[in-house]
């Protein structure tokens, strides 16, 4: 029996918190189905345009931008125009690539692709990395078939019947640290292995509160 090749578009980005889970998803898909074709769609000029090709995947950039605060800012007129351009490009990308599935990982780059894919009847999966859902994923929740989350109580943001508690995708080089590597880490950072360590980071774009 002939099996149709899996073709997946993964869209999102803007920050490492979106990009690296997306790459982990792609790696897992390729491991499960080596013949799968995967295409990334990200925002032009953002870090995904560098990180995704470095991981060995093709990416197409679209002119996606996030809304400015306050929302009545005049610059948001340009954001709205760019979003319409993104939707036109998204339709063209989907028609040419013919995906079996579209995965949205959040970030403004995923807004147009997920919206257009849902309207074209293509299955949509969202992946939300945070305990407080991002604006784009919250909006796209109504268009998704399933939503993979990392935390409990996400019914606050998404329809309960669509939620699957999966945890966050983790890169293998992080998840599979050897005991020797762990011991070296404890020693390097002068940590007590018998105590829990809390690691606080501000994200790939930095954090003003922490920096100050």
Model-derived features: where do they sit?
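Glycosyltransferases and closely related glycan-assembly transferases
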Residues: 89-102, 109-125, 138-146
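Donor-nucleotide binding loops and adjacent catalytic segments primarily
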Residues: 47, 51-55, 176-187, 191-212
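Glycine-rich phosphate-binding loop signature in dinucleotide/nucleotide-binding domains
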Residues: 33, 93-98, 191-193
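Glycine-rich, highly charged phosphate/nucleotide-binding loops
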Residues: 78-93, 181-186
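Short amphipathic alpha-helix
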Residues: 18-29
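Conserved nucleotide-sugar phosphate-binding/catalytic loop shared by glycosyltransferases and other
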Residues: 7-15, 31-82, 87, 202
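Active-site-proximal region of nucleotide-activated glycan assembly enzymes
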Residues: 37-39, 58, 118-186, 191
């Amino acid at each position: 029996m002939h099996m149709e090749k899996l073709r997946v578009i993964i869209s999102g980005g803007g920050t490492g918190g979106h990009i690296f889970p997306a790459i982990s998803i792609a790696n897992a898909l390729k491991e499960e189905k080596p013949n799968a074709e995967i295409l990334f769609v990200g925002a032009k000029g953002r870090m995904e345009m560098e990180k995704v090709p470095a991981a060995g995947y093709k990416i197409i950039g679209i002119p996606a931008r996030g809304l400015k605060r306050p929302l009545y800012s005049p610059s948001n007129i340009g954001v709205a125009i760019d979003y319409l351009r993104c939707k036109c490009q998204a339709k063209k990308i989907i028609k040419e690539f013919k995906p079996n599935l579209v995965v949205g990982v959040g970030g403004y780059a995923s807004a147009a692709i997920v919206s257009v894919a849902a309207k074209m009847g293509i299955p949509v999966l969202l992946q939300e990395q945070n305990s407080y859902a991002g604006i784009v994923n919250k909006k796209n929740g109504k268009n998704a078939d399933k939503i993979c989350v990392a935390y409990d109580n996400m019914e606050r943001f998404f329809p309960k019947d669509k939620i699957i508690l999966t945890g966050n995708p983790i890169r293998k080089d992080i998840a599979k640290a050897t005991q020797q590597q762990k011991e070296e880490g404890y020693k390097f950072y002068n940590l007590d292995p018998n105590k829990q360590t809390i690691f606080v980071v501000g994200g790939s774009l930095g954090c003003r509160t922490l920096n100050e």
